[in-house]
């Protein structure tokens, strides 16, 4: 048992965790890095927030998803999708942007990663801020109905509407309630999740897209408009 512990949890050979081996300090342990439980259940996705220069200022490019798609047809979003096996979130964001906007890799400059979002349904979304060079409003008709742009400044000057949703736990029918204190009356924790809406003449920008925009707009407002 001791050999397993020092192989997995300590830096120095033949030493185990503090309290078991005399004289070991906490700084001498800790070679193991924390992983993530049930990571195989987490769906990973990545999106690119594409910027273009238009009229002397930055615009954000949006897609309207094709009506023929099974998921979220007609919704406004950023180019992006699932992170495939063997690729990084950044690579996924670039690949999806190339496929959906029909542009080349040399037309995309990834500027920086934005804050990762954890969405309901065990989904992790990695957004990246990027700049498009020579974009001519092309898109894949199989995935996109049309594209449009909105000045980034507009989002910095307009706060989105915020609505709160409640997340509840619903056990499956075969759940062994008899083994849980309180049975079917067990008090499950409830979560709360904010949903944002931007209302534009082009359509409603909401959900994860709006949440990413809100975060980007705050940075833009603090770094640019406040100066």
What does each model-identified segment do?
Residues 1-77, 82-127, 131-136, 153, ...:
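N-terminal leader/linker segments that precede catalytic domains of diphosphate-processing enzymes
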Residues 139-174:
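Acidic, glycine-rich loop-and-strand cores that form catalytic or ligand-binding grooves
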């Amino acid at each position: 048992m001791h050999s397993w512990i020092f192989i997995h949890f300590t830096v120095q050979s033949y030493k185990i965790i503090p309290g078991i081996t005399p004289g070991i300090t906490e700084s001498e342990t800790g070679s193991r890095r924390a992983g993530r439980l049930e990571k195989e259940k987490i769906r990973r996705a990545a999106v690119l927030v594409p910027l273009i220069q238009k009229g002397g200022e930055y615009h954000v490019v949006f897609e309207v998803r094709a009506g023929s798609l099974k998921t979220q047809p007609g919704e406004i979003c950023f180019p992006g999708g699932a992170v495939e096996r063997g690729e990084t979130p950044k690579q996924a964001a670039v690949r999806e942007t190339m496929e959906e906007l029909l542009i080349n890799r040399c037309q995309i400059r990834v500027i920086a990663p934005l804050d990762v979002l954890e969405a309901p349904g065990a989904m992790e979304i990695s957004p990246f801020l990027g700049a498009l060079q020579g974009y001519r409003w092309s898109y894949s008709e199989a995935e996109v109905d049309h594209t449009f742009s909105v000045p980034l400044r507009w989002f910095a000057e307009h706060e989105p509407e915020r609505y709160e949703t409640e997340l509840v736990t619903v056990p499956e029918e075969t759940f062994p309630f008899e083994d849980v204190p309180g049975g079917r009356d067990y008090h499950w924790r409830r979560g709360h999740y904010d949903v944002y809406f931007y209302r534009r003449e082009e359509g409603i920008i909401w959900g994860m897209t709006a949440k990413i925009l809100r975060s980007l707009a705050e940075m833009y407002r603090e770094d640019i408009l406040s100066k």
